[in-house]
Amino acid sequence: MIHELLLALSGYPGSIFTWNKRSGLQVSQDFPFLHPSETSVLNRLCRLGTDYIRFTEFIEQYTGHVQQQDHHPSQQGQGGLHGIYLRAFCTGLDSVLQPYRQALLDLEQEFLGDPHLSISHVNYFLDQFQLLFPSVMVVVEQIKSQKIHGCQILETVYKHSCGGLPPVRSALEKILAVCHGVMYKQLSAWMLHGLLLDQHEEFFIKQGPSSGNVSAQPEEDEEDLGIGGLTGKQLRELQDLRLIEEENMLAPSLKQFSLRVEILPSYIPVRVAEKILFVGESVQMFENQNVNLTRKGSILKNQEDTFAAELHRLKQQPLFSLVDFEQVVDRIRSTVAEHLWKLMVEESDLLGQLKIIKDFYLLGRGELFQAFIDTAQHMLKTPPTAVTEHDVNVAFQQSAHKVLLDDDNLLPLLHLTIEYHGKEHKADATQAREGPSRETSPREAPASGWAALGLSYKVQWPLHILFTPAVLEKYNVVFKYLLSVRRVQAELQHCWALQMQRKHLKSNQTDAIKWRLRNHMAFLVDNLQYYLQVDVLESQFSQLLHQINSTRDFESIRLAHDHFLSNLLAQSFILLKPVFHCLNEILDLCHSFCSLVSQNLGPLDERGAAQLSILVKGFSRQSSLLFKILSSVRNHQINSDLAQLLLRLDYNKYYTQAGGTLGSFGM
């Protein structure tokens, strides 16, 4: 009977110890000579045999037949568990069962040497597994029932290994070490060669954008604070300078990768996973470009063997050490980041490229755009046609020559774009890549060429990592906004020139109202322009240059640049709809006023006076709304940008004393 027992405990039930799929291994009831206490001891041992049989079935099921499932990925989602982490778990589980098998062999040798040994001896000898097997079975059952997959297996095993039972902890740590072997192989391929070896989508890095977990904020966020149409949600947005979606900014040009945070083990922080993601992206980008440009050298400075040895050393450790792991990741990341920094800043002249971005997208070359506005003013007043884009680019080239900007290498990289009605092929391509434009709706044609005007720039490798299409699109939004402010300022200055030409002529009350309105409009627009160029652009750009010059780490540069662009969009109020809408309304009123003045050089007739009255009331209303928004936000003690603009507009308290209204006087 002892041999029957040992065979049953080895997974081979017989007539004395029977197997039932539901209840497992049990002592047969047909033996009256067994004392109840003996039956109890034998059934206790049978529980070990039951667990062992189920362990071996699990191992055979997921290591023997998993290869057949590889060719049917569609069935994997329905058919249950699969993947290399599961196979590694089975391998580790098998190694944990080895001491149990050895114990059965040792017992057999002891019984052969001493046939008088009792069942109690077997019970005593195998007692060490009575704690271990049920605890490991909990892990196996959880993996099966919850269909735990990939790196989630690491998390499950790790959580159960944190208990206080030394044999259980030791066994699960052994299984975890085997599973980590798979992770280290994937890490080596990704970080050293830029290869994502993940057939079953088990790794915590995936190809494609991140799924995004934006939680919907219901109507409770929309409470009206009575601040000129400013809602609670918008007020809270004022406090957040990072309102811009950063997702596409971090993407390389060829393929986009992202973290699969939901399966990242909890003992690997997200900050470490992001470093791993960055290294792999950079290596892949560089390897792909090496093929195209046959560049010499490696982004890892030919230290692949050293780093591979360090990762192998980590793999050999019986226990995972986050400190050692992060140190190795940091060393690889530092090497990659420093190489990219050198490539960007020293070889590709990043500072020069940023200067170009500032000169053109941020209107740093003011004399160029002043000349362009004068040259292109008439051709962009009307809705654009198929030839407008060509004409505008000719005008841009002529303006560049006028201001002695004759850089043959730079100008071909810049191209002014016009989105006109009927330009479907380009609009479709743009919308597929970036979504609809902020300025014009795809359903309606732009009212004028100015509304459809944009700027494109051909970014050279490897700066495309920093200046992605999404980043350039955001620069384009700022460009359109700054150009519209500059154009209004130029038109108001032209009106002032007309006023000076007629100052010797007799003027009436309507003329006084007209020129005072121009004065108030120019005051507001000039201060807005000064705020944008000095308080926002120059200030943020100098901070960006300082951060670039104070580091040798590419990732720091990218974060600084992302922060710079976010601040531009936030501090210029493009992201703050109440202020942005109000400013656009004011700019439109200024356009209308300049058109009225240009068309009526002499005294205004009755119709012109009526139009002027409408403009005065509109400007008064919008300037009052702007003042309310700026003052209300200042009173809430948030957003220093709005307070800075208010300081520019109300430095001598004239705005306050006028009741927060400009351009309001008797007709």
Swiss-Prot record:
GO terms for biological process: cytoplasmic microtubule organization; meiotic cell cycle; microtubule nucleation; mitotic cell cycle; protein-containing complex assembly; spindle assembly. It is found in: Cytoplasm, Cytoskeleton, Microtubule organizing center, Centrosome. Keywords: Cytoplasm, Cytoskeleton, Intellectual disability, Microtubule, Primary microcephaly. Its main location: cytoplasm. Pfam families: GCP_C_terminal, GCP_N_terminal. One of its GO terms (cellular component) is spindle pole. Component of the gamma-tubulin ring complex (gTuRC) which mediates microtubule nucleation. The gTuRC regulates the minus-end nucleation of alpha-beta tubulin heterodimers that grow into microtubule protafilaments, a critical step in centrosome duplication and spindle formation. Component of the gamma-tubulin ring complex (gTuRC) consisting of TUBGCP2, TUBGCP3, TUBGCP4, TUBGCP5 and TUBGCP6 and gamma-tubulin TUBG1 or TUBG2. TUBGCP2, TUBGCP3, TUBGCP4, TUBGCP5 and TUBGCP6 assemble in a 5:5:2:1:1 stoichiometry; each is associated with a gamma-tubulin, thereby arranging 14 gamma-tubulins in a helical manner. Gamma-tubulin at the first position is blocked by TUBGCP3 at the last position, allowing 13 protafilaments to grow into a microtubule. This is Gamma-tubulin complex component 4. It comes from Homo sapiens (Human). The lineage of its organism: Eukaryota, Metazoa, Chordata, Craniata, Vertebrata.
